[in-house]
């Protein structure tokens, strides 16, 4: 750096004179500003005097006002104003003494800051010049140093490169030496190390190094794999692997012939050594995969020693079920499916007892039996992927294939514990083309089944008609078979891997239910003239049964899960309103609600037809009873024994016969709705058409009550404990008509005395009337003819 004397004088900063002038200008401006208020004050003095006078006048008016007595407070007011004046003057003096000091202090601080800034500006110019010259002198050194650093980094990369090559060659030499001394376990361990180095180099851009490393790993992996595989196959051959029967598996696992301990020890050793080659095998071997359209779940390759164990079975499978072999028949998928299941079953015990302990010992999470099953299932998937395109347009062959695959899947999962997360045949059936064909075939055969079940002679007969305990629902055979069909369809698709595919099958089921409902409606319309006939009742029982089963299914876990899946799909596609989505989410509705509502509507319509039919018959048989001479019947005291009105017999006989008939033909829940609906209509009919249409003397009222309470109501006592509760109009009308004279007069007076705003509810309740309104009771009282003569 240069000395301070060499720098010379620093020219004055251009900002200093500008600062001095600015100070002077500020002083001038302050003088002007100080003078300005004085002038303005003089100009506005006249206005301010007026304002002051107004303020004082308002203040005195507020404090004193027009009351002369308040003048006494002027002294106190003057004292308060004087004190306020003194305080204000003190504040003004205090402020006027402090402000100049503050201004002086601020000016002093500003001056000091200005001086410091001037000093910094004087030092800045020589420092800038010194630094610039220093950087200029150092630039050649920096360029030389940068070149040296670049050269050193290049040398370090070369050294690292050579280190990787050297390490790889050293590992390769050691593997060779171990193999020459037949130390295979040590060689396998070194190959694992080399594989780890290869994996570490995956992100490197040194393509030649990567190729060299990969070629070296591949070279030794092939040698070790071939040797270990050969030795392992030899041991397996001595164990008679693969087993052709379950008995052979038990024999190998249970008996201990000569040399067995050494044999199993070799099996253990070779299995572990092959496991060590798993990483390098996955690195070098491209996994064989089916096309992406099958959407198989991601899964690691089958463990290497299990691959060796699977090899002879894979060879047999391809020999028998590929090409032109007689065993490779499109119409017999059950042959290869059953063969795979048999192989899994034959080897399960050996895998669990001999192989699984080896995997557990080395800390592997692999399940030997499931890994073995997974390898065999992949053979099935490859076979299905190649066969299905040839079967798509042959309905019988395709349907047979699907049936056999579903049976295979069921046994695979239930008997052999195959997890649903693994690749399975359902993934192949879920492929778009195959799945749509499956839906089409499923619909076709379901409709054919519906046609046959409805045209059957036993379609409307319950198969449990002779077993009273079982036949509570009185379900006709066609409805039973139809719901069994739906249940079978559910079992067929419930293991599909995706919710979207399940929802498509659910839509198929709903379409089938709707189709069956339409068919039932068509048959029902043909039977409308015989609404009480056997077939009409069977249709009604079928509708009720299907609705009840669907409501029960709606609470099933499987369909609740589908409901949640449907909710997510509908929310994404904006198919439903917010209210409908909310009902689905809160489980207020179900996936079958639309179908259940349609069935319930049909059920109610059919029941209404039956009730109307019976009611018409009852009305026809009640014509004589309507014309009964209620006004002139003898009183109860004039009769030895009360008996049923002869004109009521046709009415009650018709009612009894129809109730018995429908009780036998309808299921319990439907019959309960039927008789309650009929009772409601009958109650209103008797009340409106018989009671309100006539006048009653004492004998007539007693006879009506006897007919109702001792004959009509007991007809319904078989179905409930208190049948009179379903005939409230009739029951209460009989009460009013049969009140003794005193009670009737008293009630009449009470009803006449109360106003509209004060109903006579208490008085009516006291005599047992709860249903009828006050006006109805007044009408009934006027229908009585046995009032005392008051002389009016």
UniProtKB/Swiss-Prot annotation:
Residues that span the membrane, as ranges: none
Subcellular location: Cytoplasm; Endoplasmic reticulum membrane
Species classification: Eukaryota, Metazoa, Chordata, Craniata, Vertebrata
Protein name: RAD50-interacting protein 1
Family per record: Belongs to the RINT1 family.
PROSITE patterns attached to this UniProt entry: RINT1_TIP20 (PS51386)
Function text: Involved in regulation of membrane traffic between the Golgi and the endoplasmic reticulum; the function is proposed to depend on its association in the NRZ complex which is believed to play a role in SNARE assembly at the ER. May play a role in cell cycle checkpoint control. Essential for telomere length control.
GO CC terms of this entry: Dsl1/NZR complex; endoplasmic reticulum; endoplasmic reticulum membrane
Coiled-coil regions listed in the entry: 71-123
Subunit structure as annotated in this protein's UniProt entry: Component of the NRZ complex composed of NBAS, ZW10 and RINT1/TIP20L; NRZ associates with SNAREs STX18, USE1L, BNIP1/SEC20L and SEC22B (the assembly has been described as syntaxin 18 complex). Interacts directly with BNIP1/SEC20L and ZW10. Interacts with RAD50 during late S and G2/M phases. Interacts with RBL2, preferentially with the active, hypophosphorylated form.
Entry keyword annotation includes Cytoplasm: yes
Superkingdom in the source lineage: Eukaryota
Biased segments, Basic and acidic residues type: 21-30
Keywords: Cell cycle, Coiled coil, Cytoplasm, Endoplasmic reticulum, ER-Golgi transport, Membrane, Protein transport, Transport
InterPro entries: EXOC6PINT-1/Sec15/Tip20_C_dom2, RINT1_Tip20
Membrane topology type: Peripheral membrane protein
One GO process term, biological-process aspect: protein transport
UniProt domain RINT1/TIP20: residue ranges: 220-792
Residue ranges of the region described as Disordered: 1-47
